[in-house]
Amino acid sequence: MAGYRPDIPPHVADAIRSLPPDVKRGVKAAVRALSGDPGAGEPLQRELDGLWKYRVKRFRIVYGIDRQRRTIRIVAVGHRRMIYEELADRARRR
């Protein structure tokens, strides 16, 4: 079975580049792992229903799974303290 292709928008790639080196390595390794098993994370709830999270130290990768296209769309990468509030605010504004 072929893996899933990661889809990383430019703003998320910029956020990854700005992370500390150890976290950046962890995020890159996590994206590779998620490409092989996108269900390895945990599903989110409420406003973020349909998205998943994956933990890398104090940071979170938030992503969606498109099983038909076999892609994982990385929605955001950030510190756990702020990432969910930012995404929930974005979801409410839609």
Q: Whereabouts are the PLM-identified features?
A:
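Enriched for short, Lys/Arg-rich terminal
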Residues: 1-6, 18, 25, 64-94
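N-terminal first-folded block
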Residues: 3-43
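Short amphipathic alpha-helical "recognition" segments used for binding
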Residues: 26-28, 32, 51, 57, ...
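Basic/aromatic recognition patch in beta-strand/loop cores that engages polyanionic ligands
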Residues: 39-82
